[in-house]
Amino acid sequence: MADLTLDYQLADGITKAPEENAVHSWVAATLDYLQENDKAVELTVRIAALEEAQQLNNEFRNKDYATNVLSFPFNSPVELPVTLLGDLVICQSVVEREAEEQQKSAIDHWTHMVIHGTLHLLGYDHIEDDEAEEMEQIERNILASLGISDPYQTADNMELNTQ
């Protein structure tokens, strides 16, 4: 089990968000799956309101809209006794809206977004197709270990698979 310190923050006005212990367990599952558990790890997960997420996305990615998760990896210039992964900012209203639009349970989508963001902090990306395939497969495997179905399986695909 990963030695994990989580700084869990809720922005003012956020009343609907996963419990800290759940977020901790999702990050730990990601670290354990990747065997990133040989050193203590610290990260921050902030649940943000729409305006804050939009401002950060605009400032750091030049995209003037709120997105589901932003990752800010920390790259230390020196060896530290603990791995400081960085910060995740997850937009509560975007995650809740996406879950509804995609007909997923909100908690399953929250789990996916925390795992997805943690993978970004660990250096995974999805810009190129092969990177996306690798990252998505890791997400599927971690989610499956938590009893959550494939988040990339769309409702249309599910209908096709039952015919």
Swiss-Prot record:
Record keywords, A-Z: Cytoplasm, Endonuclease, Hydrolase, Metal-binding, Nuclease, Ribosome biogenesis, rRNA processing, Zinc
EC number: 3.1.-.-
PROSITE patterns xref list: UPF0054
Enzyme category, top tier: hydrolase
Molecular-function GO terms, alphabetical: metalloendopeptidase activity; RNA endonuclease activity; zinc ion binding
Localisation: Cytoplasm
Pfam families in alphabetical order: YbeY
Binding of Zn(2+), residues: 116, 120, 126
CC cofactor note: Binds 1 zinc ion.
GO cellular component: cytoplasm
Named cofactor requirement(s): Zn(2+)
Function: Single strand-specific metallo-endoribonuclease involved in late-stage 70S ribosome quality control and in maturation of the 3' terminus of the 16S rRNA.
Family statement: Belongs to the endoribonuclease YbeY family.
Protein name: Endoribonuclease YbeY
Organism annotation: Idiomarina loihiensis (strain ATCC BAA-735 / DSM 15497 / L2-TR)
